[in-house]
């Protein structure tokens, strides 16, 4: 037994199970309520449902990851059945320590294409080289180097936004990625000084903080991808920080969105499973490789459990469109 594309296919189905459908229901209902709620906030003496917004932000991040990586896993599995090797497109992006690393792990082929066919050609075109020469002469070597890089990166991220959709929310999403990456690069010397001063680089608690910070920052930026009303999205993000109310966790607000306690249990269990497998890959190695080294009875036993989980928790039946991947849009 040297390879098993069926494992990838089953893991994809597990990712696209009932938890993903529940998250989609939650997100649709939150976004449907947001616009009406934004008008009510100015007229009613109460705080907005910030916990619902935060939950939607986190669920959307989880749903996208399951949808995108699940679609790629099934594609890789089917391709291997036919003897074709397909490039891995997602490499544990939510374990990234900064946004630059995140984009080296998320939608890898897209990033490579934009780099090879937009960033580099623009960087070395004659007008850009002339601009670089002019900037070095009049503003110094440091600024001269940055001008071409930043302008090329601006075009890349603007185009990336348009590629996701011809709407302002996607453009804002792309440019926010651009701004954060550029600011991070400018602050890199300060980061290095901080790391040397406090000797935290490489320490597990600090790396966990970096991963959590990157995940939350990307989740906030991704809200512009989720909802088309840009001003309202800014307002949603703002209220999450300025009007957070921990009491919403206990007053039944989350249950009023459309999910029951049992639904939330499914979501949490699904998250734990995906997180555990991802952490296993970080600490031990590829799960698939490890499984193939086990005795056949263990391997097929795990496969049987996965099939049963799909049968019990899977979203299927009348009215369910199994081909309705978010990833199909991109």
Give names to the regions the model predicted.
Residues 1-278, 282-329:
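Membrane-embedded transmembrane alpha-helical bundles that form the catalytic cores
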């Amino acid at each position: 037994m040297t390879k098993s594309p069926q494992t990838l296919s089953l893991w994809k189905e597990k990712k696209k199970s009932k938890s993903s459908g529940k998250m989609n229901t939650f997100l649709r209902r939150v976004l449907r309520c947001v616009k009406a709620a934004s008008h009510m906030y100015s007229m009613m003496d109460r705080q907005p449902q910030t916990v619902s917004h935060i939950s939607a932000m986190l669920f959307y991040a989880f749903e996208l990851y399951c949808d995108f990586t699940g679609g790629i896993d099934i594609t890789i599995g089917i391709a291997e059945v036919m003897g074709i090797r397909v490039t891995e497109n997602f490499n544990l992006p939510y374990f990234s320590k900064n946004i630059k690393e995140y984009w080296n792990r998320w939608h890898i082929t897209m990033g490579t294409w934009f780099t090879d066919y937009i960033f580099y050609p623009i960087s070395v075109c004659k007008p850009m080289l002339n601009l670089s020469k002019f900037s070095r002469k009049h503003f110094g070597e440091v600024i001269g180097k940055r001008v071409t890089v930043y302008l090329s990166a601006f075009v890349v991220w603007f185009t990336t936004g348009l590629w996701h959709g011809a709407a302002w929310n996607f453009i804002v999403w792309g440019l926010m990625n651009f701004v954060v990456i550029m600011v991070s690069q400018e602050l890199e010397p300060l980061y290095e000084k901080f790391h040397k001063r406090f000797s935290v680089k490489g320490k597990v608690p600090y790396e966990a903080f970096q991963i959590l910070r990157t995940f939350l920052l990307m989740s906030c930026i991704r809200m512009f991808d989720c909802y088309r009303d840009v001003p309202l999205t800014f307002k949603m993000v703002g209220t999450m920080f300025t009007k957070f109310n921990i009491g919403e966790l206990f007053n039944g607000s989350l249950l009023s969105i459309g999910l029951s306690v049992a639904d939330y249990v499914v979501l949490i269990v699904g998250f734990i499973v995906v997180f555990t497998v991802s952490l296993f890959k970080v600490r031990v190695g590829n799960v698939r490789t490890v499984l193939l080294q086990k005795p056949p009875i263990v391997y097929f036993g795990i496969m049987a459990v996965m099939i049963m989980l799909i049968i019990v928790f899977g979203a299927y039946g009348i009215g369910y469109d199994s081909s309705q991947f978010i990833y199909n849009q991109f």
